[in-house]
């Protein structure tokens, strides 16, 4: 199956090259040889002739024509990162809620009940989760900080 696909592509390439190399008034189809190997060899010879006619372009010529500028897209980080307004509001509300809950004193009877224990566990879990999220975000920023340093313009 692959061999037939290669033969079909070779035939198509030979036909298109033959049409491109002829003047417009002579565009008519020629009979193709039935021997597949002869046709493939002929296609290779045509492509080699076409390559020898074209001027060679060295890698240095290509690089010298392009202007490559490498600059850092990183901006100096301030102590207080700028966050969208919605995130700031959300943080403020969360801190206010946590602050009000932490300032209320729990009586020993509250701590002995199931609700008091659940509340304390909830606060511990929330603090641990916030610390974990902060550390994870910090780690991800350190991983991807160098990805935006090189910019091609």
Curated annotation (Swiss-Prot):
Disordered: annotated segments: 95-115
Superkingdom per UniProt: Eukaryota
Membrane topology term: Peripheral membrane protein
GO MF entries: identical protein binding
PTM sites of type Phosphoserine: 47, 52, 56, 58, 64
Residue positions the entry lists as glycosylated: 34, 78, 95, 104
Protein name: Glycosylation-dependent cell adhesion molecule 1
Organism field: Bos taurus (Bovine)
Organism lineage: Eukaryota, Metazoa, Chordata, Craniata, Vertebrata
Gene that produces this protein: GLYCAM1
